[in-house]
């Protein structure tokens, strides 16, 4: 049985998501003891230096549906069809893997599809997002985080992604029918996936409060700081050690770190990640 991580990256005018994916791949190579394969789905050019870190570089299947949109999420439903693995963990590009998560694979292999539904702040406290998740709360939808989920090649996962394709391609109609309160005027994978989980009756099986799946979420409104703070990385000290440990405000960060800020991956951080991956 093949197991691996998959990330979909499409650069826009301001953000180099391919470099973020490279940084994530380096962190996976540095931290994972058992499963460290990562494949990149992209139509963007991948620098030669980056290419060797990826198990496979896969073109986006069925044409590019994202066009000129800023967030480039329109192709995410294709991940199921593009993954080269029997079992896949899907990640967002703007993340770093800081510790071995072999136990996650062990846990997830008992299921066809599993979503993260728990996030923490950099102080390692569990947080509930009431700022960005008003539509979830108002419409009683499951607390799905698409940025971290697992699936195995199975009928359940295939059907989930088929319905996801429909909801992505008809998101305004779908939101009108399933998320009409606190109406969201843009396509979001979290809300879309939550609607699909709910429609398919997967809430009990695809989400689990006791699941090990979690990540540290650095969206500023979740950090409990005064409103008006813009950048977390210029507000608290950040230190990435040469062996790939990340400290924020002198607190060592665990497992999976979702840094969110688009300019977080500097040349010096890339160098340290390269050293850790080659170490």
Task: Annotate each predicted stretch with a short phrase.
Residues 12-21:
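A short, glycine/small-residue-rich beta-strand->loop->alpha-helix junction that serves as a flexible
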Residues 59, 72-125:
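GT-A fold catalytic core of metal-dependent nucleotide-sugar glycosyltransferases
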Residues 1-8, 18, 40, 53-54, ...:
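A glycosyltransferase accessory/donor-loop signature
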Residues 41-48, 99-100, 211:
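Short, polar loop motifs at secondary-structure junctions
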Residues 106-168:
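Conserved catalytic core of nucleotide-sugar-dependent glycosyltransferases
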Residues 27-35:
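Short, acidic, metal-binding catalytic loop of nucleotide-sugar glycosyltransferases
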Residues 64-74:
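A short, glycine-/small-residue-rich helix N-cap motif at loop->alpha-helix starts
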Residues 51-64:
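Active-site regions of enzymes building and remodeling cell-envelope glycoconjugates
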